[in-house]
């Protein structure tokens, strides 16, 4: 086959590959490009500006062809979205090993990356686009929910009721924000330059409505805040223009953040450029476009800082907008914190982070069965119980039915083995894929996001995600990935991911138990090594071996 075409993962229990160990990555690769999931499927772009599932359509076809014939003792190697080899390994080895977007340090810049990309030598994999475990906007909703819940506890008495959150960016990642705010009881006003994105989030029930204009949006959002009602309003506009205007008007904003695609300046629309002219301008004059984008980001960040000066809770949501504003000469850009040091790091110290699963059958009933099972498994986790109830009521599936929640060390392995038992007993009709975002407690080096302001100054130490990937590879993962630049952009992060498959066999149970113990265990030891007392307590309580402590 040649060129773009609609892609949808097979459903049901009939294999198109030799085993579920290869059927799973095959279906998940295709699921990433399902039109319900992908932002621009014809271009192989899944989310996050230019995050791709495959380098080109020829590479996609070659990966599909290889996965359908791959044996249970073979491993396919993928170099930036292109299959480059198959080797004989063993049944405990991953069926797929993936490396995306990785560049040597001095060459790790956007201009150099784009030059190499234009030559057909690499692609941008984001985090879950090139690692084939994207589940639509739901994939980020849980983490976003956790973040806003933590902000509510820190600043607003445990709820966002009676508050108004202002944010920008309603794409595949940012589109999670309005639902996360309303699940925490608050009102949300979200700005995006693309009306189609806003309409899509309404269709998928992540956003409640799109206002006619800014005046209409402000009126509705402020009224909702006053009534202490959970409701979200989208408005078409450029955040770099809307944020300062709302500040000028004195709109009562309680919380401010942003999830525009600021990590890649070519994916951030500067002031004064129309959506229609965007792609052509960025392609023909990338340097000039980048400079204008950074100047606009500085305007937006200035407004965010001034909202903070006025008393609002403000945080960076991990898209590098502060650093881009700094590049443009704004010297107060880092006066508000990133979301991880502000709210999430205590959970990382417990090895707690994203745990997602997908029903390969395509049957929503299988996810409903797992929902019931996981709520029974952790009956005393109030935050999880609240999340699961909200997710079941509010979240629409995109592509294959999926679910996500946050679990910690000593919990993920129990859930994985339980899901495998459900498959073995026939309570779910086909195997379950179990993975996570690369944003996790021990799988990322990202000084502007996950590892910002580490206690020991180890923000930029990138050994940890590499050790994480090596650990997953040797612990029974079905596919493992190492990426560069996800979330915050080229030159700013190294991160790893793993995916396992619950197919109901005893071998799968052994693999999942080991994999889902060791993977969050990396988060515990990473934070022990950095000197976090809570991580030290967790390691002692749960028997995580720390060699440097064993001689004490």
Swiss-Prot record:
Q: Pfam families given for it?
A: Urocanase (PF01175), Urocanase_C (PF17392), Urocanase_N (PF17391)
Which residues are annotated as active site? 405
Instruction: Give the residues the record marks as binding NAD(+).
Output: 48-49, 126, 172-174, 192, 197, 238-239, 259-263, 268-269, 317, 487
Which reaction(s) does the protein catalyse, per the Swiss-Prot or TrEMBL entry?
Answer: 4-imidazolone-5-propanoate = trans-urocanate + H2O
Its domain of life? Bacteria
Q: Which InterPro entries match?
A: Urocanase (IPR055351), Urocanase-like (IPR023637), Urocanase_C (IPR035401), Urocanase_central_sf (IPR038364), Urocanase_CS (IPR023636), Urocanase_N (IPR035400), Urocanase_Rossmann-like (IPR035085), Urocanase_sf (IPR036190)
EC number, as in UniProt: 4.2.1.49
Give the record's GO biological process terms: L-histidine catabolic process to glutamate and formamide; L-histidine catabolic process to glutamate and formate
Q: Which Gene Ontology cellular-component terms appear in the entry? A: cytoplasm
Per the entry, what this protein does is: Catalyzes the conversion of urocanate to 4-imidazolone-5-propionate.
Name by which UniProt lists this protein: Urocanate hydratase
């Amino acid at each position: 086959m040649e060129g773009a075409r609609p892609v949808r993962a097979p459903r049901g229990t009939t294999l198109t590959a030799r085993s579920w160990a290869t059927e799973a990555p095959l279906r998940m690769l295709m699921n990433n490009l399902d039109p319900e999931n992908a932002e621009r499927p014809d271009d192989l772009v899944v989310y996050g500006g230019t995050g791709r599932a495959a380098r080109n359509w020829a590479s996609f076809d070659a990966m599909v062809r290889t996965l359908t014939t791959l044996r249970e003792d073979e491993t396919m190697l993928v170099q930036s979205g292109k299959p480059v080899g198959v080797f004989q390994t063993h049944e405990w080895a991953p069926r797929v090993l993936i490396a995306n977007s990785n560049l040597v340090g001095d060459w790790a810049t956007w201009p150099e990356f784009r030059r190499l990309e234009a030559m057909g030598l690499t692609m941008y994999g984001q985090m879950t686009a090139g690692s084939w475990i994207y589940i639509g906007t739901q994939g980020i909703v849980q983490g976003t929910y956790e973040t806003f819940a933590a902000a509510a506890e820190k600043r607003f008495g445990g709820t966002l009721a009676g508050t108004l959150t202002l944010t920008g960016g309603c794409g595949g990642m940012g589109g999670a924000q309005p639902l996360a705010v309303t699940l925490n009881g608050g009102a949300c006003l979200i700005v995006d330059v693309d009306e189609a994105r806003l309409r899509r989030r309404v269709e998928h029930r992540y956003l409640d409505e799109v206002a006619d204009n800014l005046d209409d949006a402000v009126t509705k959002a402020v009224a909702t805040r006053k009534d202490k009602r959970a409701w979200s309003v989208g408005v078409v506009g450029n955040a770099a223009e809307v944020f300062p205007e709302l500040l000028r008007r004195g709109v009562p904003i309680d919380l401010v953040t942003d999830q525009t695609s600021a990590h890649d300046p070519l994916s951030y629309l500067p002031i004064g450029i129309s959506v229609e002219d965007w792609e052509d301008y960025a392609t023909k004059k990338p340097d000039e476009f980048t400079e204008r984008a950074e100047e606009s980001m500085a305007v937006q960040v200035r407004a965010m800082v001034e909202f903070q000066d006025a008393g609002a809770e403000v945080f960076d949501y991990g898209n590098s907008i502060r650093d881009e504003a700094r590049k443009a000469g704004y010297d107060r850009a880092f006066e508000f914190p990133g979301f991880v040091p502000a709210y999430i790091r205590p959970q990382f110290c417990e090895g707690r982070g994203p745990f997602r699963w997908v029903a390969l059958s395509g049957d929503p009933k299988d996810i409903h069965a797992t929902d019931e099972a996981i709520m029974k498994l952790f009956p005393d986790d109030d935050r999880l119980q609240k999340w699961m109830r909200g997710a079941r009521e509010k979240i629409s599936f995109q592509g294959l039915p999926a679910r996500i929640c946050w679990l910690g060390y000593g919990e993920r392995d129990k859930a994985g083995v339980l899901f495998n038992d459900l498959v073995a007993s026939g309570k779910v009709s086909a195997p379950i894929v179990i993975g996570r975002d690369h944003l996790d407690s021990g799988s990322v080096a990202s000084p502007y996001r996950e590892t910002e302001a580490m206690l020991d100054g180890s923000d930029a130490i990138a050994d940890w995600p590499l050790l994480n990937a090596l650990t997953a590879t040797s612990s029974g993962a079905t596919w493992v990935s190492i990426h560069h630049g996800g979330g915050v952009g080229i030159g700013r992060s190294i991160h790893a991911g793993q995916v396992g498959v619950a197919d109901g066999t005893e071998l799968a149970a052994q693999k999942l138990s080991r994999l889902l113990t060791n993977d969050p265990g990396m988060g515990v030891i990473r934070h022990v090594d950095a000197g976090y007392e809570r991580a030290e307590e967790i390691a002692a309580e749960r028997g995580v071996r720390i060699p440097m402590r064993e001689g004490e």
